[in-house]
Amino acid sequence: MTEQTRPLDVVILAAGQGTRMNSALPKVLHPVAGRPMVAWAVKAARDLGARKIVVVTGHGAEQVEAAVQQPGVAFARQERQLGTGDAFLSGASALTEGGADILVLYGDTPLLRPDTLRELVASHREQGSAMTVLTGELPDATGYGRIVRGEGGAVERIVEQKDASDAEKAIGEFNSGVYVFDERAPELARRIGNDNKAGEYYLTDLLGLYRAGGATVRAFRLSDPDEVLGANDRAGLTQLEATLQRRINEGHLKAGVSISLPGTVLIEDTVEIGRDVVIEPGALLRGQTRIAGGAVIGAYSVITDSVIHERAVIKAHSVLEQAEVGAGSDVGPFARLRPGSVLGEGVHIGNFVETKNARLDAGVKAGHLAYLGDVEIGAETNVGAGTIVANFDGLNKHQSKVGAGVFIGSNTTLIAPRVVGDAAFIAGGSAIHDDVPEGAMAVARGKQRNIEGWARRYWAAPERREKLAKKLPWLAGWLSRTQG
């Protein structure tokens, strides 16, 4: 086995509580750009082709394990928070095969690029190191452990912030907490002591143990120290979110997506977008959303777990969840497609139209103020303004079916379950409580009756008339003028 073909195991330390988050959610489960922070570390490990990935959990262990449970990921519990050395030993106990380099990552540093980690591992192997420390340089490295070098620039030790002298605190080179070890690390880690101010077992002490045995310890310096930024509080979380979102948006721009005002647009990492898509300011694209080429996403639209086909237009302020929009269709503005909504090609959904568990075939038009729930609507049907599919009886939802080429007049209510045949007409204002045959005209409304003088008698009642002058002066005058 050569240096370059030796397997790589990854241990991800994710046991901390994160008290400064002031949250019931474990720190590493706070989402950044669509993934929990710890899931970014798991993704990076997978991208490296790791043989085995072990996530060390502690606080909120069951929640963390449920969030990143997947094939190839194992878990180890750190029962007591005794420091990074103890956490590493917990994780190493699950590495039973041996013969691998071991990469240590943290569950709260989602900005680390897989390419950086790939270069780190390659450097470790090419230089024949027993331990390689990923370091960075900052004008003020407060909060980080410092890298103390000796003659010739060799890495001599890592000093934690709380144990550092004033001279050591002035050092700008910091320890990122990311390491590559050879296969001896678990055995050496058992010799780590806790003779420090915190009484903890520091993983950094492995450096001294390796050096004491004559092994080579080297550093690999980051070109961009922001890659190892973590989040200890909500402010740090927003900084991570902004950095990752900028990366994601820049990636889409390079891939041929037009994004107006990228700083206002949120696109989660799991979203896929085709070429020549236009995304207007304020859009939020989430989950497993897929957007095909040539589509337009209007300003302030929110799209989650949905499929948008070629040339579809989602107009401003529309909300889509678990929906599918066919090629060339347009939705909105101010429309809502709820789960189970499937629009065929060339469908028009206008302002203030809501759909749920609804299938609309090619060319259907619902232009204004409609609710279409639990319904199938055939091709080229026109749904008038104010149409409601009354699908709920107080206990159960009921399914309706409307054929192709149907004309539904404004302010119609379909009282489910109903079937409307192809090419039927429904007169405006109808409440349809029976099925409508193919080609028929359905009219279901009461005959208009005008009751002369009713308004005058209504407003002239003593309990109303005395309030008219103050609240409705024009009406009070009309009442006076029309009384005989």
UniProtKB/Swiss-Prot annotation:
Which GO terms of the molecular function aspect are on file? glucosamine-1-phosphate N-acetyltransferase activity; magnesium ion binding; UDP-N-acetylglucosamine diphosphorylase activity
Enzymatic reactions: alpha-D-glucosamine 1-phosphate + acetyl-CoA = N-acetyl-alpha-D-glucosamine 1-phosphate + CoA + H(+); N-acetyl-alpha-D-glucosamine 1-phosphate + UTP + H(+) = UDP-N-acetyl-alpha-D-glucosamine + diphosphate
Statement: the UniProt record of this protein carries the keyword Transmembrane: no
Q: Which residues form the active site?
A: 368 (proton acceptor)
Q: Any idea which positions bind acetyl-CoA? A: 385, 410, 428, 445
- Summarize subunit and interaction data from the UniProt record for this chain: Homotrimer.
PANTHER family (UniProt xref): BIFUNCTIONAL PROTEIN GLMU (PTHR43584:SF3), NUCLEOTIDYL TRANSFERASE (PTHR43584)
- Protein name in the entry: Bifunctional protein GlmU
Q: Which organism is it from?
A: Deinococcus radiodurans (strain ATCC 13939 / DSM 20539 / JCM 16871 / CCUG 27074 / LMG 4051 / NBRC 15346 / NCIMB 9279 / VKM B-1422 / R1)
Write the lineage as a comma-separated list.
Bacteria, Thermotogati, Deinococcota, Deinococci, Deinococcales
